[in-house]
């Protein structure tokens, strides 16, 4: 077995040792150690952190430098003053055992209590048999009757944070990868956590990927996410071998936000964000009695020869993104992990869905009963699962914890959601489950703009590739200030249905004004023709004949109100709740007030899909006319927020889809009435993704 030379003390003078087959655990006065024939780690007792990770003799971390050269380790934004990195003075344990398959395992346990509040963070890492990775679980508890409500759990994450020059590339998904930037700390800061490095022309990141670097460029949506990490191309390894360091989503049940959640995954650090408010995600409150465990996830390390590519090592890691993988092992260690449910309390949830005609990429979600899965942070026992529905309508989700859930089904090209509460998932269920989804309808659809896909990516600067760089990342990933709105739309948005092109003639963000704050390319805000979008369309006399009601539906993929990312308390100011107004031919007007708890940074943080909600405006069809009709969609002029960091102060929404329908043979509604379409306990937020009109 290879013994690390740099930290050989960790493996010398062992006070205790346990070995079965090829796995060895040991302890001395300064370190705990886990090792097999290829892979070894050492945890320093002085700080409670892993300080050495080696694969086949190659140091994967580098020297300790502050919190760099460590990991994986746990930290949080959870104490009254902000961030806390537990470990120093923590309770530490070395765990040994053999699982039900006869395979040896070793584990490291760290638990630390913040004395001022009595909140505890705990972390487990397990090494099993000949595997070259660590199984990770994290736990947070808060018990304090004196202060029953402490604050929000703003962030909880584990980090593999190397200091070595070994790692040369990042990989967030199959389609998004590139060389690590060399000089991101020495460029021009253009907004919070965003740097211009385009003048560093010899930086491979600049020449191949982008002139701007922000960790938000390297975020991913959870729906189809399997693995992310760092790659070494062999240019700096000891023998020319290639290496990978990966975080594998082998389970997703203890994350929040369902398949629409997105988060940071890698920059120079391989993250596992268990909780965050990024992209407007809600976070749980730490109240007396809070007790939750996250995991398992798998930190995996692999090696190839000099010809092995990033894609090869990534594909190897992705094989483990399977909730059924290592189930026997997780059952065997369940007694070590509070709140974790072994296989005896799990079952397979399977069945068939009758889908609306035209449904594409349908998905079924199991989540907290009675709650929008995007807001499933209130119950510490909340779990979530999802699966793609195949062409026959069939689905199967393995290893679901028995309980009562909400079912949510949605699909591209279909407006709305199918929602059913109080669905019991039990081992005793002998028959497959069956659901029938009928698309929401209000008359005959007259037009539709965009794709109902829960994102604003089809519009200008969305999913389209940035062809100015060889790796061609999606445009929305790049710093928003690169795209000058006045240059793109000098006359504002004037979209005519049937003639205009959504990919060119609608922006991925609807601004209240175009900001200069956080925009190094513009010294003054721009206000002309920004907050009002005009959509025109033609109607014939036949289309209007014998109709009473028109319905305008808008679905949005995110919104920023003056509340910013603050979720549960409205900030002082005019636009904590953001009004978005529709005017029809100057004859009808109605306002949708987007509530503060749906607010979040989305587009300015390189995203096109965040909190999703929708709205229906119903009005008498007599407000429409034969020939040209005009909708004006308005945010308040100059609506802004107060920013404590260098961030844009303009408020905005991002539309997914819009559409219009005409409905015959119904009485006309009250012209001042509109309806919010949400789910669970509320329904607000805004970032456009698709809109339609029905008449």
Curated annotation (Swiss-Prot):
Gene3D superfamilies: 2.70.98.10, Carboxypeptidase-like, regulatory domain, Galactose-binding domain-like
Subcellular location: Secreted
GO terms of molecular function: carbohydrate binding; rhamnogalacturonan endolyase activity
GO annotation, cellular component aspect: extracellular region
Catalytic activity of the protein: Endotype eliminative cleavage of L-alpha-rhamnopyranosyl-(1->4)-alpha-D-galactopyranosyluronic acid bonds of rhamnogalacturonan I domains in ramified hairy regions of pectin leaving L-rhamnopyranose at the reducing end and 4-deoxy-4,5-unsaturated D-galactopyranosyluronic acid at the non-reducing end
Signal peptide annotation: 1-21
Catalytic activity, EC: 4.2.2.23
Alphabetically ordered keywords of this record: Carbohydrate metabolism, Cell wall biogenesis/degradation, Glycoprotein, Lyase, Polysaccharide degradation, Secreted, Signal
GO biological process, one term: cell wall organization
Keyword Ribosomal protein attached: no
Alphabetized InterPro entries for the sequence: Carb-bd-like_fold, Gal_mutarotase_sf_dom, Galactose-bd-like_sf, GH-type_carb-bd, Polysacch_Lyase_4, RG-lyase_II, RG-lyase_III
Coiled-coil positions: none
Known glycosylation sites: 28, 96, 118, 144, 199, 285, 532, 638
Membership in a protein family: Belongs to the polysaccharide lyase 4 family.
Function: Pectinolytic enzymes consist of four classes of enzymes: pectin lyase, polygalacturonase, pectin methylesterase and rhamnogalacturonase. Degrades the rhamnogalacturonan I (RG-I) backbone of pectin.
Protein name per its UniProtKB record: Probable rhamnogalacturonate lyase C
Gene (name only): rglC
């Amino acid at each position: 077995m290879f013994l690390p030379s740099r930290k050989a003390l960790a493996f010398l003078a062992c006070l205790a040792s346990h070995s079965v087959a090829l796995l060895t655990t040991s302890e001395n006065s300064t370190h705990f150690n886990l090792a097999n024939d290829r892979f070894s780690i050492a945890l320093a007792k002085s700080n409670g952190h892993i300080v050495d990770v080696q694969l086949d003799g190659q140091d994967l971390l580098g020297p300790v430098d502050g919190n760099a050269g460590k990991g994986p380790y746990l930290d949080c934004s959870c104490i009254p003053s902000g961030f806390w990195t537990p470990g120093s003075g923590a309770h530490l344990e070395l765990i040994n055992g053999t699982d039900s398959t006869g395979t040896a395992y070793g584990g490291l346990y760290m638990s630390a209590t913040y004395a001022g509040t009595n909140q505890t963070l705990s972390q487990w890492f397990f090494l099993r048999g000949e595997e070259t990775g660590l199984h990770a679980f994290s736990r947070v508890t808060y018990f304090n009757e004196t202060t029953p409500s402490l604050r929000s759990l703003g962030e909880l994450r584990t980090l593999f944070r190397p200091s070595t020059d070994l790692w040369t590339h990042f990989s967030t998904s199959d389609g998004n990868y590139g060389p690590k930037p060399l000089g991101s700390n020495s460029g021009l800061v253009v907004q919070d956590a965003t740097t211009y490095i385009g003048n560093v022309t010899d930086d491979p990141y600049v020449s191949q990927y982008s002139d701007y670097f922000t960790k938000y460029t390297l975020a991913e949506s959870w729906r189809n996410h399997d693995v992310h990490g760092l790659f070494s191309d062999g240019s700096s390894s000891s023998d020319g071998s290639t290496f990978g360091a990966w975080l594998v989503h082998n389970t997703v049940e203890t994350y929040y936000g369902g398949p629409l959640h997105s988060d940071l995954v890698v920059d120079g650090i391989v993250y596992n964000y268990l909780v965050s408010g990024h992209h407007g995600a809600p976070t749980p409150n730490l109240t007396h009695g809070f007790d939750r465990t996250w995991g398992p996830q798998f930190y995996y390390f692999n090696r190839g020869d000099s010809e092995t590519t990033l894609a090869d090592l990534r594909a190897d890691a992705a094989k483990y993104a399977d909730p059924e993988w290592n189930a026997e092992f997780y059952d065997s260690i369940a007694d070590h992990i509070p709140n974790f449910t072994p296989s005896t309390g799990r079952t397979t949830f399977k069945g068939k869905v009758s889908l609306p005609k035209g449904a594409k990429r349908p998905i079924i979600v199991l989540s907290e009963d009675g709650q929008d899965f995007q807001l499933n942070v209130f119950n510490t026992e909340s779990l979530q699962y999802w699966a793609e529905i195949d062409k026959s309508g069939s689905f199967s989700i393995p290893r679901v914890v028995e309980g009562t859930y909400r079912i949510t089904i949605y699909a591209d090209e279909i407006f709305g959601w199918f929602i059913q509460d109080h669905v019991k998932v039990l081992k005793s269920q002998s028959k497959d489950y069956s659901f029938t989804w009928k698309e929401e309808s209000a008359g005959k659809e007259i037009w539709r703009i965009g794709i109902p896909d829960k994102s604003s990516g089809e519009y200008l600067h969305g999913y389209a590739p940035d062809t100015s760089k060889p790796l061609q990342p999606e445009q929305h990933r790049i710093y928003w200030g690169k795209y000058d709105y006045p240059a793109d739309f000098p006359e504002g948005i004037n979209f005519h249905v049937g003639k205009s092109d959504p990919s060119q003639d609608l922006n991925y963000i609807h601004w209240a004004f175009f900001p200069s704050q956080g925009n190094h390319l513009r010294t003054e805000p721009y206000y002309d023709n920004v907050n009002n979008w005009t959509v025109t369309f033609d109607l014939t006399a036949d289309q209007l004949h014998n109709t009473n009601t028109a319905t305008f539906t808008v679905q949005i993929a995110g919104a920023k109100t003056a509340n910013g990312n603050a979720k549960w308390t409205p900030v002082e100011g005019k636009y904590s709740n953001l009004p978005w107004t529709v005017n029809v031919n100057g004859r009808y007007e109605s306002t949708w007030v987007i509530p503060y708890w749906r607010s979040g940074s989305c587009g300015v943080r390189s995203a096109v899909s965040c909190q999703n909600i929708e709205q229906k405006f119903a009005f008498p069809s007599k407000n429409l006319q034969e020939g040209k009709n005009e909708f004006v969609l308005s945010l308040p002029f100059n609506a802004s927020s107060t920013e404590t960091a260098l961030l844009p102060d303009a408020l905005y929404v991002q539309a997914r889809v819009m559409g219009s329908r005409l409905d015959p043979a119904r009485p006309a509604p009250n012209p001042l009435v509109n309806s919010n379409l949400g789910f669970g306990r509320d329904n607000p937020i805004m970032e456009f993704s698709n809109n339609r009109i029905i008449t």
